[in-house]
Each structure stands twice: as C-alpha cells, then as structure tokens.
Amino acid sequence: MLHRLAFPVMSWMLLSCLMLLSQVQGEDSPKKIPSARISCPKGSQAYGSYCYALFQIPQTWFDAELACQKRPEGHLVSVLNVAEASFLASMVKNTGNSYQYTWIGLHDPTLGGEPNGGGWEWSNNDIMNYVNWERNPSTALDRGFCGSLSRSSGFLRWRDTTCEVKLPYVCKFTG
C-alpha cells in the first residue's frame, strides 16, 4: 500500500503526463505538404517561389510598375541576391532583348535627396541587402532615379536611368 503523502505527488505526475501527451501527440491525418514547384502562366518562368516575365513592349518605369501590379502580388522585379541576378540575366539575354537597359523595381523616390544614394528602394518594399551597381548613382552627372539592368554588364548589374525612358521590363509575381 502507498503512503498517503504519495497520492498528491503521483496525481501531479499523472496530470503532467496527460498535459504533455496532448502537446506531443500527432494529428490523425497529416496535413498536405505544399508542392515545391509552382505553376506560372505561359510566357513566364519559375524561380524559387515566384514567376518572372519579361515584357518586350517598352514602357516608362511607372507604367511598367503599374502593369506588373495587375499580376498576383506583382511588381517590377526585385533582385535580392547573386543567384537571382544570374537567373534574370540569363532570362533577359535568352529572349533576344535588343535594348541597352531593362527596367527592374529599383527606384529613388527621394530623387537623390538622401546622401550617398540612400534613397534607393524596391517597389515591392523588399529590403535592399544586395547591391550591384554598374556605377555609383549618387555621383553620376546624368543620373536617373529608376533602376535598370544594363546590357554592357550582361544584364547582371544595375544602372540608374531616367524614369520616363520607355524600356522592356521584368515582372516578379506569385504563381
């Protein structure tokens, strides 16, 4: 027979085990695991979690951004790392794009008002941790306030361009 002081301790242990059981017990039916592959519309390419589409009909930066926003969570492309930059460069080169520049989602809404080019940002508000300028936009005499991929860099590097120029553009959106 158990000592009478053992009952409260054992009751507490049993209660603790039951509480833990509810936290570690698995679900009866497993949840559907999302597919690693995304489905993109015809004419666009998948990379990571997004679809990318190059549009050859030239637009101003602002009109291109508005056109991209018509797609699900769409904006002009933000280039967040070297791998994405390489993917984009390959995509733009393989389409036979004959323009010197192609719009991306980079712009400076301060129109150079921030020192050392600090006003540049992505149109979709992604954080700008990766930078790949062809030239320093804050020191150029003919500087623009919208970003583009430059043909002379193999479409890997960025160039500040006048926003009113009509250029092809790349949209980034969800599938």
UniProtKB/Swiss-Prot annotation:
Molecular function GO labels: growth factor binding; hormone activity; identical protein binding; metal ion binding; oligosaccharide binding; peptidoglycan binding; signaling receptor activity
Highest taxon, organism lineage: Eukaryota
Tissue: Constitutively expressed in intestine.
InterPro entries in the record: C-type_lectin-like, C-type_lectin-like/link_sf, C-type_lectin/snaclec_domain, C-type_lectin_CS, CTDL_fold
Record-linked Pfam families: Lectin_C (PF00059)
SS bond list: C40-C51, C68-C171, C146-C163
Subcellular location: Secreted
The keyword Nucleotidyltransferase belongs to this UniProt entry's keyword annotation: no
Disease: Overexpressed during the acute phase of pancreatitis.
Record's protein name: Regenerating islet-derived protein 3-beta
Originating gene: Reg3b
